[in-house]
Amino acid sequence: DVYKRQNMEWYFVVWYLAATGARVSELIRIKIEHVQLGYFDLYSKGGKLRRLFIPKILREETLKWLCETQRTSGYLFLNRYGDRITTRGISQQLKNYADKYGLDSKVVYPHSFRHRYAKNFLEKYNDIALLADLMGHESIETTRIYLRRTASEQQALVDKIVTW
């Protein structure tokens, strides 16, 4: 049943990256105790305290999974040897899954989920100052970099907006 456990673990790795906006270096430091609390306090790049919130639905589903696997403490994400997963391990496995499912491995990497988090957040709740705080950015200008649109997104928006 190791195969199923590892697949579920990767399901949650992707969900955490997408739903928390965590950097991969932050993700690997999340412990089961943080999931139980609903957040993880960490110091961002600039040495500033940042709280990484774990959304309610993700927290509930994670706790169910942890109950099934009978895990109650320690790092949330482990490698096949039971040690804390590494950032490199996550990057490599995401690349493997991208290849397996026919996705472009150049766009499936840990930090791409952080960009997606930023875009999704602003689409649902248009407050860039709050988003900057949640992402641990000192400046809104840093956050704006995450929100740049691709050429195809720009084209689609122009086509939708400019109808004259």
Which stretches of residues belong to each language-model region?
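Conserved tyrosine-mediated DNA breakage-rejoining catalytic core shared by Y-recombinases
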Residues: 20, 25, 29-64
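C-terminal catalytic core of tyrosine-transesterase DNA break-rejoin enzymes
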Residues: 15, 19, 114-138, 145
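Active-site/catalytic core of tyrosine-dependent DNA strand-transfer enzymes
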Residues: 55-105
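Catalytic-site neighborhood detector that most strongly recognizes the C-terminal catalytic loop/helix
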Residues: 46, 135, 140-160
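Phosphate-coordinating loops and pocket residues in cytosolic domains that bind phosphorylated ligands
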Residues: 29, 37, 145-148, 163
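Basic, Lys/Arg- and aromatic-enriched nucleic-acid-binding interface segment
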Residues: 4-24, 69
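Short, leucine-enriched amphipathic alpha-helices that occur as contiguous helical runs
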Residues: 10-11, 87, 91, 114-115
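Short coil/turn motifs that cap or connect alpha-helices
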Residues: 23, 104, 138-141
